[in-house]
């Protein structure tokens, strides 16, 4: 579990060294494939302890974040080229309607993603963090301000940040559950059933954004607002045959069927077709998709 790699070749230098994200990913795969239960208690505990060993305290990061040193060093390697790009972005951001992410923002989002994934995966196998994670954004007024600052015309990224707050709320005794549920009321689109403010440019973005927000609502134990509308939208906008698009699409339909039987027969057929599409992406020689 310490040397889990997602591919046999094609990895970057950093990709060959990172540990936390891939170990967490490996644990999730073990759980999904039923292999987790085949491990003995000592093996399970060792894996959980390994993931929890990444809980660290760094400046500019929330207390007890999950931090892979390789990821930390990558984002904090201040090369001349990197500093120049950041300076240019900051300058361009002065112009109205431009909002380029500087490296520090990208770094914090990366750590947030790894922290959320670690906490969520541990919860999935009935385990928890060794130390309580304390997000920077915990007060209601700060959380509302943060959510308002996100670009909701790109719900696949903003939705990911929303979902992470839902995870943190759940593990901290539902501390901001009502605020997050109320905020989803502001995002939902009555026509598509998805969640955004300004309409994204492509259907795949609308479906992917729905996947992110629906995963957050699942953590909150909250209902999907318009599951029938979302099912109709997905049926009208089938994805291209790419891994992430298919998985996002299937997840959205699956979650909707948990709440309604609307067009259930048609959706179940889509699931069967999607399995065949996913099989086409499998490379036998690489033993992966």
Predicted regions and their residues:
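Low-complexity, Ser/Thr/Pro/Gly-enriched N-terminal "stalk/linker" regions
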Residues: 1-23, 32, 42, 48, ...
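Extended alpha-helical scaffolding segments
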Residues: 24-31, 39, 48, 250-289
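Well-ordered alpha-helical segments within folded domains of soluble proteins
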Residues: 19-32, 110-124, 154-169, 205-217, ...
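Positions within ordered alpha-helical repeat solenoids
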Residues: 32-35, 53-57, 124-127, 186, ...
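Helix-loop junctions that connect tandem helical modules in alpha-solenoid scaffolds
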Residues: 12-15, 102-107, 146-155, 194-200, ...
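Carbohydrate-binding/catalytic loop surfaces
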Residues: 2-17, 65-105, 197-212, 252-259, ...
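Extended ligand-binding groove/face enriched in aromatic
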Residues: 38-182, 186-190, 267-273, 277, ...
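Long, repeat-rich segments with strong aromatic
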Residues: 167-266
């Amino acid at each position: 579990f310490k040397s889990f790699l997602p591919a046999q070749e094609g990895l970057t230098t950093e990709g060959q060294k990172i540990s936390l994200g891939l170990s967490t990913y490996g644990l999730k795969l073990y759980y999904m494939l039923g292999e987790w239960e085949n491990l003995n208690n000592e093996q399970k505990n060792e894996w959980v302890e390994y993931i929890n060993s990444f809980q660290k305290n760094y400046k500019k990061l929330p207390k007890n974040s999950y931090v892979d040193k390789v990821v930390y060093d990558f984002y904090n390697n201040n090369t001349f080229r990197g500093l120049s790009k950041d300076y240019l972005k900051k300058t361009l951001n002065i112009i109205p309607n431009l909002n380029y992410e500087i490296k520090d923002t990208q770094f914090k989002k990366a750590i947030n993603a790894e922290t959320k994934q670690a906490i969520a995966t541990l919860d999935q196998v009935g385990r928890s963090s060794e130390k309580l994670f304390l997000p920077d954004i915990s007060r209601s007024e700060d959380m509302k301000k943060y959510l308002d600052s996100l670009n909701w015309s790109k719900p696949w990224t903003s939705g990911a940040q929303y979902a992470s707050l839902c995870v943190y709320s759940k593990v901290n005794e539902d501390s901001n559950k009502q605020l997050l549920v109320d905020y989803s009321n502001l995002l939902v689109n009555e026509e598509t059933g998805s969640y955004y403010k300004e309409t994204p440019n492509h259907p795949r973005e609308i479906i992917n954004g729905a996947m992110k927000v629906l995963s957050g609502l699942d953590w909150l134990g909250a209902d999907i607002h318009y599951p029938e509308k979302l099912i109709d939208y997905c049926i009208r906008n089938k994805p291209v045959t790419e891994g992430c698009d298919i998985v996002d699409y299937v997840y959205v339909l699956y979650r909707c069927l948990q709440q309604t039987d609307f067009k259930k027969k048609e959706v179940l057929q889509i699931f069967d077709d999607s399995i065949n599409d996913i099989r086409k992406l499998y490379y036998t020689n690489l033993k992966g998709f």
